[in-house]
Amino acid sequence: MTEDTETSSTGAGADDRTAAISRETAETTINVTLAVDGDGEATVDTGIGFFDHMLETFAKHGLFDLTVRCDGDLDIDDHHTVEDVGIVLGKSFNNALGEKRGIVRYADRSVPLDEAVATVIADISGRPHFEFSGSFSQPQIGGFTSDMARHFAYSFTMHSEITLHASIEGINAHHEVEALFKSLARTLDEATQLDPRRGDTPSTKGEL
C-alpha cells in the first residue's frame, strides 16, 4: 500500500463549487466527492454504521451532495477512519469554496434533539482554529467512539481552514452527537451561501 498519496480536483469556477479527493495512507483509503450547492444526497460507506448515518445526516441538513468511501483499519479501532474522513472532507470543502468570493462567511446555529442541544459558530476565515466545550454522556454508540465526534470536528476544521466553536449538552450520547452533526451542517450551509450584494471576498485583506 502506498504510504501517503493524494489526488484532488475542483469545479471549473464559482458556479461549480465541487471537489473530489482521493487519499491513501497505510491506515485508510478514502474517496470523497462534494457539491456544496447540492440537494442533500449522500452515499456513504465507512464501515462504521453510526458514522455513516451521521455523514448522511450532515449532507441532508446542509444540502450538500456527498459521497464518502473509506476502507480503514477497523480491526484496530475507529480512530483513523473517523479522523481521516474528517481530514479529507475538510480539504474538500476548502477546495470547493475556492477563493470564497461572495460568501456570507459567518454563521451560527443551535440544534436540539430531545434533551440534547449543540451549537456551532463558524467563520470561513482561512485561519484554522477549533474550540469545543462539553462532553459526551456515554463512551460508545455502537461501533463509534463518542469522543471521535469531537475529533472529527477538529480534523474537519483544521483542514477546511475555518474557525469553529462548538458545544454540546445532554444526557444521551446518540442525541448529542447527532445534534452536533446537524448543527455543523446548518451552520456551514448558511456560511457558504452566496450573498448577492457581494461579489468580492468578504475580508478587508482581500483574501481568505
From Swiss-Prot:
Superkingdom, natural source: Archaea
Q: Subcellular localization, per the record? A: Cytoplasm
Query: What is the reaction catalyzed?
Result: D-erythro-1-(imidazol-4-yl)glycerol 3-phosphate = 3-(imidazol-4-yl)-2-oxopropyl phosphate + H2O
InterPro entries given in the database record: IGPD_sf, ImidazoleglycerolP_deHydtase, ImidazoleglycerP_deHydtase_CS, Ribosomal_Su5_D2-typ_SF
Which EC number(s) are documented for this chain? 4.2.1.19
Pathway, per UniProt? Amino-acid biosynthesis; L-histidine biosynthesis; L-histidine from 5-phospho-alpha-D-ribose 1-diphosphate: step 6/9
Keywords carried by this UniProt record: Amino-acid biosynthesis, Cytoplasm, Histidine biosynthesis, Lyase
Provide a GO CC annotation, any one: cytoplasm
**What GO annotations for molecular function exist for this entry?**
imidazoleglycerol-phosphate dehydratase activity
Q: Where is this region: Disordered?
A: 1-22
**Would the keyword Nucleotidyltransferase be found if you checked this record's keyword annotation?**
no
| Gene Ontology process terms (BP) | L-histidine biosynthetic process
Q: Which NCBIfam families match?
A: PRK00951.2-1, PRK00951.2-4, PRK00951.2-6
State the similarity comment.
Belongs to the imidazoleglycerol-phosphate dehydratase family.
| PANTHER family reported in the protein's UniProt record | IMIDAZOLEGLYCEROL-PHOSPHATE DEHYDRATASE, IMIDAZOLEGLYCEROL-PHOSPHATE DEHYDRATASE HIS7
What protein is this chain from?
Imidazoleglycerol-phosphate dehydratase
- Recorded source organism is Haloquadratum walsbyi (strain DSM 16790 / HBSQ001)
UniProt gene name: hisB
